[in-house]
Structures are given as C-alpha cells and as structure tokens.
UniProtKB/Swiss-Prot annotation:
Protein name per its UniProtKB record: Non-structural glycoprotein 4
Main location: host cell
Organism field: Rotavirus A (isolate RVA/Human/Belgium/B4106/2000/G3P11[14])
Domain of life: Viruses
Subcellular location: Host rough endoplasmic reticulum membrane; Host membrane, Host caveola; Secreted
Chain's role: Plays an essential role in the virus replication cycle by acting as a viroporin. Creates a pore in the host endoplasmic reticulum and as a consequence releases Ca(2+) in the cytoplasm of infected cell. In turn, high levels of cytoplasmic calcium trigger membrane trafficking and transport of viral ER-associated proteins to viroplasms, sites of viral genome replication and immature particle assembly.
Length: 175
C-alpha cells in the first residue's frame, strides 16, 4: 500500500520506460516501435493497476485463491484482446454458471411446451365435442314457432265475440 502513494516509485518506473524507449529509438532499423511502445504501455498499466488491486483484494477477501485466479484470468483475457484474439479464457466457475443458465432456460422452455401442448389438446377436445353436437342434432323436426314468435297467435275464429282486438275503434273527440 505504501507504493501506491509513493511518487518517487512511480517516477522511477516512468524514467525506466523513457530510457528504454530512447534506447530503442537510437537503433535506426527499428520498425516496430509503435508496437513495442503499446506493449510497454499495457504492461505498465497492468503493473500499476493489478498489483495494488490484488493486494487490496487479498487483504479484504476471505478466499484469496479465487481472487488471484480471477485477476490472472482477467489479465490474460486483456492481453488476448489486445493481440486481436476473440477467444477468452474462462474458469470452471464461469462455465458452471453458463451451464446452469442454459439448463434453467431449457427447463423453462420445456415447461412452456408442456403448457402449450396441454392447451392444444384441450382445444382439440373442445372442437371434437362441438363437432359431435353439430352432427348428432336432427334438423328435420325443428319447431320454428319459437323462432318467429307465433306461439300465441289466434285466428279470427278463436277471438272472443269474433272481433279483432287490434282493429282501432271509433273514437270521438270533443272540439
């Protein structure tokens, strides 16, 4: 932790990098300077970021092995990305998490398929019942009097006194 705030230590690392870069620049045949400079920059950044982070993590965490493993895997993945690789290093924990997630998703989809299958079977059964009712019902003896509302219609002979009750009677009004 004391090296985190030590300005002289940081300046000495920067001076070491600058002197290394100047020695590389003195060689006129050096065509890969930008690549070497970027690698040195990445290494310096990793050095400054990972060592204090690992020290703090080891002091505060209970399981130091997992922290070290995670930090090393992260550093290697960063280097692989900088090198242009799309693959990454994964730990067993990450693989197990991904497998659990895949298994959970498969279970959820199987439950959904089961529900949909049950619903489809119920719908097919309902359609079969409707079809059976439509085919069993006889159509030659349907009482249409209910449909046209003529159940209580009387003929002229059936009316009392032979008089149509719906004919208007004469009404006289005084003016």
């Amino acid at each position: 932790m004391d090296k985190l705030t030590d300005l002289n230590y940081t300046l000495s690392v920067i001076t070491l990098m600058n002197s290394t870069l100047h020695k590389i620049l003195e060689d006129p045949g050096m065509a890969y300077f930008p690549y070497i400079a970027s690698v040195l920059t990445v290494l310096f950044t990793l050095h400054k970021a990972s060592i204090p982070t690992m020290k703090i993590a080891l002091k505060t965490s209970r399981c130091s092995y997992k922290v070290i493993k995670y930090c090393i895997v992260t550093i290697f993945n960063t280097l692989l990305k900088l090198a242009g690789y799309k693959e990454q290093i994964t730990t067993k924990d990450e693989i197990e998490k991904q497998m659990d997630r895949v298994v959970r998703e498969m279970r959820r989809q199987l439950e959904m398929i089961d529900k949909l299958t049950t619903r489809e079977i119920e719908q097919v059964e309902l359609l079969r019942r409707i079809y059976d009712r439509l085919t069993v019902q006889k159509t030659d003896e349907i009482d249409m009097s209910k449909e046209i509302n003529q159940k209580n219609v009387r003929t002229l002979d059936e009316w009392e006194n032979g008089k149509n009750p719906y004919e208007p009677s004469e009404v006289t009004a005084s003016l």
